[in-house]
Amino acid sequence: MTNIRKTHPLTKIINNSFIDLPAPSNISAWWNFGSLLGICLIIQILTGLFLAMHYTSDTATAFSSVTHICRDVNYGWIIRYMHANGASMFFICLFLHVGRGLYYGSYMFSETWNIGIILLFAVMATAFMGYVLPWGQMSFWGATVITNLLSAIPYIGTSLVEWIWGGFSVDKATLTRFFAFHFILPFIISALAAVHLLFLHETGSNNPSGIPSDSDKIPFHPYYTIKDILGALFLILTLMLLVLFSPDLLGDPDNYIPANPLNTPPHIKPEWYFLFAYAILRSIPAKLGGVLALVFSILVLAIIPLLHTSKQRSMTFRPLSQCLFWLLVADLLTLTWIGGQPVEHPFITIGQLASILYFMILLVLMPIISIIENNMLKW
């Protein structure tokens, strides 16, 4: 009798995706982040669902409802901080996942890569709208500043901003719609993640060598299920250490002050995971130029496959490209630091140089270095 796991229409899909899936025998821990992102998404949906049961999306009561969750709801504080810090863990895993894709040439699977970029935009939009919901000072002013960027769009800009706001400023209508979108987007992200996996399973996983691994496959279960469980334990341990010992480490103290349209905080800045993009936005004096640079800082990933000039897929055996890659990582860390600094003399210049270097590495230096490496190897 054939195993029901392999024949039943429902279990067959699960079996072919997570159990009998042929996987390369040499994929490293850098391939764990896909499953970790799935776990992050599940944690965020579950904690978010329980928060939504007690949260009220009204300007008069939003801040108080979050306080009520932390003080009066059973284990409300842990749910709230798991959700807030879960977002940080989500973005750490996202950045490492994208970095892995860049390093090992996984972007050559163009459909998977492009769905991944759409997912990145969707997660960033969700996180931004979620940050507005507690209705603290940074929530209000962050929402005002970021939505205002759309007014840089010629001709329709101002009307577009007022349409998004549902009025002439960030107010009750804005908060209500942001809550609605923040609630629905994670489910859209789940569907997109399924499509992301669907396209990945059309080609099979890449591996650290960048060489096709069809001749050397192993079943996903038990080898990679156990490896993913280990990664998940590390993820949950890190998250719980953050939640239980320093839940406000990555947050902004200004968000514990209720939103006040008459009082602007001294330094308006987004959460840490947006600081690199915020630094790029601020480094260009023109409003429209800044907005375009901001969007292109993520959208640039879409043209990476077109700029792949190397004869090898992965950077494993390409030391010059490796140096450039780690320079890019250092540059992104610099941008993150600059994004959190005030707009003053040394920081402005550093931010502008780091922004230029970011685009230079991805669009100019990487393709040139790859050609040089090809010639060095006489390929």
UniProtKB/Swiss-Prot annotation:
Heme b b566 binds at residues 97, 196. Its cofactor is heme b. Heme b b562 binds at residues 83, 182. Binds 2 heme b groups non-covalently. One of its GO terms (cellular component) is respiratory chain complex III. Gene3D superfamilies: Cytochrome Bc1 Complex, Chain C. Its main location: mitochondrion. GO terms for molecular function: metal ion binding; ubiquinol-cytochrome-c reductase activity. The chain crosses the membrane at residues 33-53, 77-98, 113-133, 178-198, 226-246, 288-308, 320-340, 347-367. It is found in: Mitochondrion inner membrane. A ubiquinone binds at residue 201. It is a multi-pass membrane protein. The cytochrome bc1 complex contains 11 subunits: 3 respiratory subunits (MT-CYB, CYC1 and UQCRFS1), 2 core proteins (UQCRC1 and UQCRC2) and 6 low-molecular weight proteins (UQCRH/QCR6, UQCRB/QCR7, UQCRQ/QCR8, UQCR10/QCR9, UQCR11/QCR10 and a cleavage product of UQCRFS1). This cytochrome bc1 complex then forms a dimer. Component of the ubiquinol-cytochrome c reductase complex (complex III or cytochrome b-c1 complex) that is part of the mitochondrial respiratory chain. The b-c1 complex mediates electron transfer from ubiquinol to cytochrome c. Contributes to the generation of a proton gradient across the mitochondrial membrane that is then used for ATP synthesis. Belongs to the cytochrome b family. Heme 1 (or BL or b562) is low-potential and absorbs at about 562 nm, and heme 2 (or BH or b566) is high-potential and absorbs at about 566 nm. This is Cytochrome b. It comes from Mustela altaica.
